[in-house]
Amino acid sequence: MELDAYVSARHGGTGFNPRDLDALLARVERICAAHPERGLAEVWREQKKTWHRGPWKTTMTRCRDILAAGDHNEDAFFFGIWLYAYDQARDGSNIGEALRDIPAGAAELVWKECAHTPDAPLLDVLRRMQGK
């Protein structure tokens, strides 16, 4: 997920589908094994362009979409984590450190903020909550 968020942030990717990650990773691993001279991020970016992008979009997913998915929806949960990592990569931060430093209860805080601003893009809410 970190690699996908990083490549998307750095190379204009906007979609995420957590259900595609395992198959996409397997495909990228095969290509990298056959062509070790190619960079991992380059291969990932190339393969993701041809892959299903999913319903979750960086700038189009609104709080109401997350709320409608329900608080036990794994896809929505992983999209929230991915979007946070995407935003950190876009700002030049270390994604791994940022993900390790997410405070306990952060998801609940995002849910509460989204309930107050259902029409807001989720990315805007995450950025506002970080003081960006």
Residue ranges with predicted function:
Residues 1-118, 124:
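Short N-proximal segments of mature Sec-exported proteins
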